[in-house]
């Protein structure tokens, strides 16, 4: 897709926003994958393993991440279509008649991309390390090169079709891994699995009061709420604004916000990431050899290596 985009897109609009031609279905999947990404696959179950169901309530970010898109995305698309904006810097500089804002948007985009990409690459590196035995740094660098290649050569169109595959792997992987963990012989099915969870220390099962540190660690109700509010920035980021500029029509916006993010990803997170995190905690406390030295970054890779069939 990177090479295809390189040979077919000859304008700045074609490269940066796919010529405003991203189709309905592709946007649904790719934008949802971009909203959640590798952190949800690797880090989310890892924090459930570490802090228990107190953190699992943060899965409600499937509601808060699309909220900013609900408020602003359609208006952003209309302005981009009407005035021909290609980047968010174009939009803000024109709207406020101030070129300084263009550079502020660029700085925001660079800082956002550096740290957000670093989280994803760290997750990928941890996965490579456990599954393939490749050092974490080498795995992260290898993935960074692949991303750099298809983004630089193919632009947003290449990123979109890669995002479609990423969505299938993300949601499908979470559900499949959670299912295999729950049905593993070590647990003996749903009844035995739920009984094992009930036997855990209460700090892994209860959410603290509004502000009451200790039980459940730092994940108090207020902490969970502010954490979810912080994630609202994803769909208001400069990168996501360019996704919005790139679609053919605003029709997929509501479907992405209400159905794909909230229902589809929510189904995977509320159930199957909890199965993964709590299952790993049970096995660790039971003295399972594979989970003796796991940490937040390696919980999911170890689960994959232990429970998934070889062909996966």
PLM feature spans:
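Hydrophobic alpha-helical transmembrane segments
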Residues: 1-16, 51-57, 87-91, 111-117, ...
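Structural signature of transmembrane alpha-helix termini at the membrane-water interface
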Residues: 1-7, 67-75, 118-125, 149-156, ...
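Membrane-interface "cap" regions at the ends of multi-pass membrane proteins
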Residues: 1-42, 154, 173
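Membrane-water interface regions at transmembrane-helix termini and the short interhelical loops
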Residues: 2, 47-51, 75-79, 123-131, ...
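Transmembrane-helix boundary/entry motifs in multi-pass membrane transporters
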Residues: 15-33, 79-114, 248-251, 255-264, ...
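Loop-to-helix junctions at membrane interfaces in multi-pass transport proteins
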Residues: 19-22, 43-50, 54-58, 93, ...
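Residue-level recognition of pore/gate-forming positions within transmembrane alpha-helices
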Residues: 34-35, 62-66, 109-110, 144-148, ...
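Helix-loop-helix module between adjacent transmembrane segments
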Residues: 56-151, 226-233
